[in-house]
Design a protein with these regions (language model features):
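Multi-pass membrane glycosyltransferase architecture that uses lipid-linked
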Residues: 1-224, 270-416
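Luminal/periplasmic active-site loops of membrane-embedded glycosylation enzymes
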Residues: 38-51, 222-274, 373
Length: 416
């Protein structure tokens, strides 16, 4: 696809996003008003992020969170600034897909289309708004920031830029930890491990040094996540919620760790089961992926899917991790049809969030459908990788275990 057409596509899609999202700038958001704005103002005024404000995210998230407060530290000013900041990252993702995704025009346009439809649907810009936030979900959270770095890392890996992809992925880890679990996918076939290690270590060591120099400590963020129990929107919780709607007793919700959690006999065991199954699925996909001919985008999408689907905490914004990667991997394929349906039912569930206290059917059923769709999506993206891995690992193919080298278009080629 000629560069001028790529640039034209980027401009047009950016204009569409601006037209849809700019009118929402400043809309009320519970997390921005009640959490991020007070935390940002306190840190700007000298308090420590972890010791004093109990920030739950890695160190490089702090500049992202507090930057708007330096322009206007009023609550409304912070909300406006934060949403503009996230809109800038949204536009950066569009530009990156339009200009850097290899392939013909159809691949680029379909990726941009899937990303746009998914983002608009999940953000409630066209559909009814969420009952949690009036503002768009994509602009009320900062998940687009690490997602941009993940997207850049995969594109750099396709171009065999060892230091670049590792550095970008490490920056994502330093903002929100989930990109750490994508290293195995991008290490497949990598020949310059020294550059990967050095480039990946620099952002993390810089963050650690900054925390130490400030006299702060990061342990509270780790403790926060290890103490979280089964969240109402997780796959494991859906079993209890559906049972409650069908008449089972002893199932309720409670507020804890920034959200609603399931209280029921067996909920703790279900949470641990989700972790165990998710870990097993993750390592299985890594093993199969190293033996398969899946592209980097496909393997990263599969690993993200297993992380999201089996997480004991499955917040709606986690789907933003998947969306642009899956859009680039599968375009208008059935995988993304299922993912977009899952996003649609996520938004429907958010429109009925007033049913979370009583676990009413209007909340539980859309959520259950969403989780089934996410399971279906995981099956669609993981099954080809597992099948391919098994074939390559068969006795007749044991001489061909070397992972494929991926060309710039993400197509397996012979090692050079």
């Amino acid at each position: 696809m000629p560069t001028r057409w790529r640039a034209t596509a980027a401009v047009l899609v950016c204009a569409l996003h601006l037209a849809l999202f700019v009118p929402t700038i400043g809309d009320w958001s519970s997390i921005l008003v009640n959490d991020f704005a007070p935390q940002a103002k306190a840190i700007k005024d000298g308090e420590l992020p972890y010791r004093d404000q109990r920030i739950e995210y890695p160190p490089l998230s702090v500049p992202v969170l507090i930057a708007p407060a330096y322009f206007d530290d009023s609550t409304q000013g912070f909300v406006d600034g934060f949403m503009w900041e996230m809109l800038a990252f949204d536009l950066a993702i569009i530009v990156l897909i339009a200009l850097a995704l290899p392939g013909e025009g159809g691949r680029v346009l379909s990726a941009l289309g899937v990303y746009t439809v998914g983002l608009v649907t999940l953000s409630g810009v066209v559909l009814d708004r969420s009952l949690i936030d009036y503002g768009p979900l994509a602009l009320d959270r900062f998940d687009l920031v690490p997602t941009l770095f993940v997207l850049g890392a995969v594109l750099a890996r396709d171009r065999e830029r060892s230091a670049t992809w590792s550095g970008l992925l490490s920056l994502g880890v330093a903002i929100k930890a989930f990109p750490l679990f994508l290293y195995p996918a991008l290490l497949r076939g990598e020949r310059n491990l020294r550059r990967v290690i050095v480039a990946g270590a620099i952002p993390l060591l810089a963050c650690a040094a900054a925390v130490i120099v400030m006299g702060d400590e990061f342990g509270s963020a780790i403790t926060y996540h290890t103490e979280r129990t089964l969240q109402v929107e997780s796959l494991g919780a859906s079993v209890f919620e559906v049972a409650h709607v069908l008449g089972a007793s002893g199932v309720s919700t409670g507020v804890g760790h920034g959200g609603f959690e399931i209280s029921a006999s067996g909920a703790t065991a279900a949470g641990w089961l989700s972790v165990v199954v998710g870990a097993a699925g993750y390592f299985w996909l890594v093993w199969a992926g190293w033996r398969s001919k899946a592209t980097n985008f496909e393997l990263v999408a599969a690993l993200l899917a297993v992380l999201v689907v089996f997480a004991p905490v499955l917040s709606p914004q986690f789907l933003l991790w998947l969306l642009p990667v899956s859009a680039c991997a599968y375009g208008l394929g059935r995988q993304n049809i299922v993912l977009l349906l899952a996003i649609l039912f996520t938004q429907i569930e958010l429109q009925h969030y007033d049913g979370v206290d009583a676990l009413s059917g209007s909340f539980v059923w859309p959520l259950a459908v969403r989780n089934v769709l996410l399971l279906g999506y995981l099956a669609l993206v993981a099954a080809p990788i597992v099948r391919d891995g098994r074939k390559t690992a068969s006795p007749s193919d044991r001489g061909h275990r070397r992972p494929p080298n991926l060309s710039r278009g993400g197509v397996a080629t012979a090692p050079r």
